[in-house]
Design a protein with these regions (language model features):
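Conserved alpha-helical scaffold segments that buttress catalytic/binding sites
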Residues: 1-154
Length: 154
């Protein structure tokens, strides 16, 4: 790749799909399901979040990604994983998503791992909401980033 001379062998993927984990899935089409399965991506649906609790899910997620190493971790947080009750300003609003506390817990656990190297938070769109929803979504997005980068209550 031009500009990425440190990638000596372009045949080796930069990110292995088996090192990815999705949390909070609840609305997938057949193609998305097939894609996730075919690449061996670890995925936890909202059913599993409800069944095991977000604490156990995050324990399994971090064990899968980090194992017993301190490798760098990238968190990609899609705000539409959160229930629209808490974050309505997004293009894909599907009821039954992560609760306010579950979303924050994910970010807090990533911060506690000490391995966060980078983060993106996507799908925040303040133009797609009713009165007040834009502020709730933006405030939550800022809070999630703050939590993931180590801001804590104490």
């Amino acid at each position: 790749m031009k500009g990425f001379h440190w990638l000596n062998d372009e045949s080796i993927p930069v990110l292995l799909p088996t090192r990815l984990v999705y949390v909070g899935l609840r609305d997938l089409d057949k193609g998305e399901k097939a894609f996730i399965r075919s690449l061996g991506i670890k995925a936890y649906t909202m059913h599993e979040v409800d069944k095991f609790g977000i604490g156990k899910i995050m324990e399994m997620v971090l064990d899968h990604i980090l194992g017993r190493t301190d490798r760098p971790l990238h968190l990609s947080f899609d705000i539409d994983a959160v229930d629209p009750l808490y974050a309505p300003s997004t293009g894909t609003r599907v009821a039954g998503g992560l609760s306010y506390r579950e979303a924050y817990y994910i970010c807090e656990e990533v911060a506690h791992s000490g391995c966060l190297a980078s983060m993106d938070l996507v799908e925040v769109n303040p133009t797609l909401t009713t009165a007040g929803g834009d502020e709730r979504t933006v405030d939550m997005a800022v809070g999630l980033i703050s939590s993931a980068t180590g801001n804590s209550i104490l």
